[in-house]
Amino acid sequence: MSNTSILKDMGSYKTTLLSALINSDDICELLFNKKPYDEDDVDNLVYTQIFPYLYIDETQTKVLTYLCFEVEIPRIPTGTIKDMKLIIWAYCHKDTMKYSKKGYSGTKVDILVDMVEGQLRESDKFGIGKLQLLSCTNFSPNNKYYGKQLVYNMPDFKISNR
C-alpha cells in the first residue's frame, strides 16, 4: 500500500500548525495569562486550550482562552493541484476580554488572532508559497464566549510527500 494520499496533508499541516502555536512565547503567555511558564505547561495546552478541531465545551467550569483549527480541502481543481483551507478559531470568555501587551491593541481575542497571523504570515511550511489570509470574522460559540475565525487559503500539490 502506498504511503501517499490526497488527504494526508490535512494531518501533517495540523501537526505543523500546532508546533508553530506552542512555540510562540506571546501566544503561550496569553493563553496561560501568566509569565513565566515552563515546558510542562506548554505540553498541557494541547487538548486543554489548543485543539486540532473545533472544540466547544458547554459544561466547562474554568474560564479559559482557546485556539482551535481545522484543515479542509474544499476542491481539487486540477489533476496536480488541490485547494486547501486552514481555519483557526480563537475565542475566550467574555469576562476575560481585557488584555494588554506592548505592541498590540484591542481585546484579548483581537490580540490573539494578531499573534497567530504574525506567526503564520511568513511561514513557507504550508502548501505552495505563503499562506493567504482570506478573512477574519466574528465567531460566537455560545452566549458566554466570543472570538474570531481566521480562514487561510493554501494551494498545494494534489499528492505530496510530506
Predicted regions, residues:
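Short, flexible/disordered intra-domain loops and linkers
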Residues: 3-6, 98-107
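Small/polar-rich, solvent-exposed N-terminal microdomains that initiate assembly or binding
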Residues: 1-78
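Residue-level signal for secondary-structure boundary sites
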Residues: 77, 94-98, 158-162
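Acidic-leaning, charged glycine-interspersed low-complexity segments
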Residues: 28-30, 60, 106-162
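Solvent-exposed residues in well-ordered beta-strands and their adjoining turns
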Residues: 72-74, 89-93, 153-157
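Short acidic, glycine/tyrosine-flanked loop/strand segments centered on an H-E-D-like triad
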Residues: 83-100
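A general secondary-structure signal for short beta-strands and their flanking turns/coil
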Residues: 62-66, 81-85, 143-149
